[in-house]
Design a protein with these regions (language model features):
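N-terminal active-site beta-alpha-beta segment that forms phosphate/nucleotide-binding
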Residues: 1-80
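Conserved phosphate- and dinucleotide-binding cores of soluble alpha/beta proteins
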Residues: 2-10, 61-217
Length: 217
């Protein structure tokens, strides 16, 4: 059977469904920032950004951008009623102190035990950029990952062991790819959802770690 990969917006929308009411959440640079567009209005979700924002909202309408309102990815944002601004040092204290419920990050590699690599490929010409990723990986109560299932070269991003420098060890709780959703558990990597038309065997063939089929039916 044929299958269609999820778009970046579809991945973001899927993650938004799993963010509970009242959660304090950091959205990493790149794909995770799209999640703010899909949070339902009936949920109170407090979005945090490393540069010192709490309770920001989706991007403003074109022409209504405020150059002083940007997130850590230098993207324009809006502020919700009751939102707060604070020092960069205070922001990192929130991250490191266990005050964030969820961090949503990107990844170069995720190991089957939950190890994460997302700051450096180890290539001699690569520019390392850890930012606040290490602080979030160890400080947030839960870590969600959004990523393509394979690289542009077709190599698995979900692997048995990291070959890139680690960001955090045993820190990942759930992985959202363009093909599936995986829970990282003590028993192993459990596939709880996959795109329609994709068989479990096909998914396993594109994954460098052993998967457990936990899909319903």
């Amino acid at each position: 059977m044929s299958y269609t990969k999820l778009s970046r917006d579809q991945i973001a929308e899927r993650v938004a469904q799993d963010i509970p009411d009242g959660a304090y959440v950091n959205l990493g640079i790149g794909l995770p920032t799209k999640i703010s567009n899909y949070l339902p209005s009936d949920k109170d979700v407090f979005l945090h950004s490393e540069n010192g924002l709490l309770a920001f909202g989706p991007p403003p309408a074109k022409g209504e951008e405020d150059p002083e309102l940007i997130n850590a990815g230098k993207e324009f944002v809006t502020m919700l009623t009751g939102g707060a601004f604070f020092h960069h040092g205070d922001s990192f204290a929130m991250m490191r102190g266990g005050h964030l419920d969820i961090a949503v990050l990107g990844a170069f590699q995720i190991a089957e035990n939950g190890d994460l690599a997302n700051w450096h490929t180890g290539a001699p010409d690569a520019i390392p950029a850890v930012g606040g990723a290490m602080d979030l990986a160890v400080g947030a109560k839960k870590v969600f990952i959004t990523t393509d299932h394979v690289t542009k070269q077709g190599e698995p991003k979900i692997v048995a062991e990291l070959s890139y420098p680690a960001t955090g060890l045993k820190c990942v709780d759930r992985v959202y790819t363009d093909l599936c959703v995986i829970d990282v558990t003590a028993e192993g990597m459990k596939v709880i959802e996959k795109v329609e038309g994709l068989s479990f065997d096909e998914l396993q063939s594109m994954t460098g770690a052993k998967l457990i089929d936990a899909t319903k039916g």
